[in-house]
């Protein structure tokens, strides 16, 4: 059921464009119902009549009231997207995949960013629902360890789907990369380049992506019989200053750290800047691997080895799955939930070549 506020109903029914179908009908001396059918491309109206009506509509500057039309159809042909930060290349590439796929399917996209704040994320969900989007694509904030707002969205029947960062909610689909394998590959790469004491910058372990990247890090250590040292695992919000603080902590340890795997490129770059300021040579003294392949990672000196994520493809797949859920009956949605896991790839650059 779609609930419509009184304000929306008044707007949809009475705040029309300057020209209406009645103006077109009056000018052509035909019924308004015929004009309506023609504007909706009904086969009941001849092409000749359609052409006359379209010409007059253009002449009068007529524009359809999409809100009224959508209210009648009980859909808006709009999906909402919430990302932590639009400025991150990974999320902007996901958005590109979403927008292109949605556009091809006749949908508009509303893009929002939580700025890693749970309070803001809650408000954005409320706003999107108030705007009656047909569905939502969401990558949760670092603060999202409680998700009553998402359960509310599920319970009111609005289709939504996670990408990249997700919460474990039953019957909700996700499109992810193999974060465990990415963490494993990054760490093993450092080990194969001679590193033994490898620091790891991670995010909140309540979020599956950081938990899985950390698990991959630990598995690589285990495979190569390198003991895990808890002081080498540094958790933060993974901003650039967090990377610098993490680097400072690693340099204060009583033994030499010779490698760093950061769960994102931003913190890795912060660490690199700090190491260079302290006279630490990269990769000779410390080799570094990031995660996400931000464009800047290829331009800094030395260039940053990183894990690449197929952001555009994630956006495409997530949108296609969401549109499938939107088009199916509510009773069928619970049976459609699926987790799609895509592969990541290691891009070797100068920060880890010894």
Description of each model-found segment:
Residues 197, 228-232, 281-287:
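Short acidic capping loops at alpha-helix termini that bridge into adjacent secondary structure
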Residues 84-93, 111-120, 140, 165, ...:
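Hinge/beta->alpha junction and helix N-cap segments in small-molecule ligand-binding domains
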Residues 27, 32-37, 72-87, 189, ...:
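Short beta-strand segments enriched in small/hydrophobic residues
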Residues 1-16, 20, 74-188, 192, ...:
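Alpha-helical recognition/docking segments in bacterial nutrient-uptake
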Residues 1-77, 353:
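N-terminal helix-turn-helix DNA-binding module of bacterial transcription factors
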Residues 6, 248-354:
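Flexible loop/turn connectors
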